Amino acid sequence: MKALALLAVLLLSGCASIYSTPPTAIHQPMSARPDMRAQAVPATGSIYQPSQARPLFEDRRARNVGDIITINLVERNTAQKSANASATRGSAITGGISLTAPNIASLANAKLNGLQADVGLDSDFSGEGAAAANNVFNGTISVTVIDVYPNGNLLVSGEKMVAINQGNEFIRFSGVINPTTVTAANTVQSTQVADARIEYRGSGFIDESNTMGWLQRFFVAIAPF
């Protein structure tokens, strides 16, 4: 009975969907609803309306919760690292003893002369490691203003999902934008965003094929070599 229950669990795990949303390191919402507008006051014939304040000589740019900004992803990072280590250790012990045993001369080969002992130890270690990384990420993504800080900076985040054949691709972005870096076209370079978090993940059988299985991870964790 226990064997049947275990077999049923294994079969059900095989039926689990592999198209779930991949995990993310961004913990804030991906979107936000705009704040409620102030109640409109009766029109007095003035051009300026307090409920819809916008500079007269400025293009429309994001500045409030719920507004949208386009991020130009122009990330390029290169890193190199190398390390070398070498250690050598050696030691030797030599000793000599001369013994004569006349009382047991009747025994064959009982006479011990020139007994000598030599002990030596030699240890050598050499290690070398190198790593290099080169990442390029280009594209665009539109994000939503999640919060406006007291100093006017904008907290933004957004997500884009693209379904391609048998899998889904997710692009996520979050960060803090200085409103002065927003262009007249309501865009900003990703290199000008503070605390930027950029994710590019996928879900589907292709992504699953690049992931180590849980049983294999278990044996790798306990393997002593």
Swiss-Prot record:
Keyword 4Fe-4S applies: no
What's a single GO MF annotation on this record? Answer: cytoskeletal motor activity
Q: Which residues are the lipid attachment points (N-palmitoyl cysteine)?
A: 15
What is this protein for, i.e. what is its function?
Assembles around the rod to form the L-ring and probably protects the motor/basal body from shearing forces during rotation.
Q: Name one GO biological process term.
A: bacterial-type flagellum-dependent cell motility
Give the domain of life: Bacteria
Is the keyword Magnesium in the record?
A: no
Q: Which GO terms describe its cellular component?
A: bacterial-type flagellum basal body, distal rod, L ring; cell outer membrane
Q: Where in the cell is it found?
A: Cell outer membrane; Bacterial flagellum basal body
Q: How does it assemble?
A: The basal body constitutes a major portion of the flagellar organelle and consists of four rings (L,P,S, and M) mounted on a central rod.
The family assignment reads: Belongs to the FlgH family.
Lipid conjugation (S-diacylglycerol cysteine) is at 15
**Record key words, sorted:** Bacterial flagellum, Cell outer membrane, Lipoprotein, Membrane, Palmitate, Signal
Q: Which InterPro entries match?
A: Flag_Lring (IPR000527)
Give the matching PROSITE patterns: PROKAR_LIPOPROTEIN
Which residues, if any, are the signal sequence? Answer: 1-14
The topology of this chain with respect to the membrane is: Lipid-anchor
- Pfam families the record matches: FlgH
The identity of this protein, by name, is Flagellar L-ring protein
